[in-house]
Amino acid sequence: MAITYDTYEDLWEHSEVLEGVHEVLSEVAEVDGVPAISEAFLRGIDEDRGHKHVVAMNGDRVAGVLAIDPDRVIELAVAPEVRHSRVGIALFEALRDQLGVSGGIDVWAHGDSAGAQRFVESLDARRTRELLKMSVDCPPATKAAKAMEAGGAEAEKRCAEQDFEVLSYTESVARFDADSVDAEWVRINNEAFAWHPEQGGWDVDYLRSARDTNWFDPDGVLMLWVRDENSAAERVGIPCAANGGEGNDDVFRLVGFHWTKIPLEEKEKDAGERTGEVYVVCLADDARGRGLGQAITQLGMKSLLENGCGRIELYVEGDNAPAVSTYKRLGFEVVHTDVVYRGRL
C-alpha cells in the first residue's frame, strides 16, 4: 500500500489523527530509547502554537510526522517499520511542495543516532548546536543522595550568609503578589537567556502558558530574593511598602530561580524511584561570581530528593563549558546528545 502525506495547519483539531500520531511517537521512543519530539513540539501538536505538520499515512495507520514551528525549526519521527523507505525524505518534500516551505531550516536530531546522521547528510545539512542530556542516580540513602543533601544544606547556609532569602513560588506570591512575582521571573529569565533561541524573549503571558502543564508544581520553583536598600531613582523589583514592608526606599529583587520538574507519570511511582529534572536554572547578571549558581542548583536538587526522586536529569547547551563543568562536579554525566542540523529545502 502506498504511503500518502497529509498536511495540517490545525492538527490539534483532528482527534483521530492525533491519536495515531501519539501512538507512533510512543513506539519511536520505545525503540530508539529517546523521544523524537520535544515537549515544546508535543504542545504544538496538541494545541495551537503556530506549528504546521505533515503526517505520513500507511493506510489507516500513521507512519510518520514532521512538525515545523514559526521559527522554521523542525522535529520529526518515522515509524520503525517504514524506516529506510524514504518516508523521512518524503515528509520534507511534502513540507516544501504542499506547505510551500523553502530555504533555510533547522532540524533537531534527538539522540543524534547514526540513522539520523545519515538522513541529515542527505539534506546537505551541517551541525550547528548540541544539547547535552546529563543525569545522576541518587536513590535514597546512597552516597550520591547523602552528598546532595549535604550540598543542599551548605547552599542554604551560603545564601543566608549573603542575606538572600529562598522562597518557593507559592511563598513568593503569598509574600508579594502573582503579577509582581511573574514580572520579576520574566525579567531575570530574559536577562540570563538573552542569547537563547527558546528560553529568551519571554513575556508574562508566555511564562504562564509554559506553566500550564499537568506537571507544574509552584512549590517546585525556588526563587532567590534579596532586599535592596539602594536609593537609586530607577530600580527594578517589588516595593516593600506595597507588600507590608517598612519604608518606600526598599525593594525585593529576584536574583535567581530554579524551576524543577517531576513529570506526572513519575509522581505516580514510589518515592525513591522517580526521575526529576533540573528544568531551568537562572541567575541575574549582577549576582554572578558569588557561588549562587551552584547554590541554587543544589537547592533544587535537594528539593527533588525530598520529593522522592532517585534520579535527576537536566539539559544543557554543549558549548556552555562552565555549566557542564559545574554539573559534572555535582555528579552528572552525559547520557546522550541532541543536535540541531541546518540545511535548505
Swiss-Prot record:
It comes from the Bacteria. Residues 6-149, 164-345 form the N-acetyltransferase domain. Acetyl-CoA 2 binds at V281, C282, L283, R288, G289, R290, G291, L292, G293, Q294. Its EC number is 2.3.1.189. It catalyses: 1D-myo-inositol 2-(L-cysteinylamino)-2-deoxy-alpha-D-glucopyranoside + acetyl-CoA = mycothiol + CoA + H(+). Acetyl-CoA 1 binds at L76, A77, V78. It is an enzyme of class 2 (transferase). SUPFAM superfamilies: Acyl-CoA N-acyltransferases (Nat) (SSF55729). InterPro entries: Acyl_CoA_acyltransferase (IPR016181), GNAT_dom (IPR000182), MshD_Acetyltransferase (IPR050276), Mycothiol_AcTrfase (IPR017813). GO terms for biological process: mycothiol biosynthetic process. Keywords: Acyltransferase, Repeat, Transferase. 1D-myo-inositol 2-(L-cysteinylamino)-2-deoxy-alpha-D-glucopyranoside binds at E39, E198, K261, E277, Y315. Gene3D superfamilies: 3.40.630.30. CDD domains: NAT_SF. Monomer. Catalyzes the transfer of acetyl from acetyl-CoA to desacetylmycothiol (Cys-GlcN-Ins) to form mycothiol. Belongs to the acetyltransferase family. MshD subfamily. This is Mycothiol acetyltransferase.
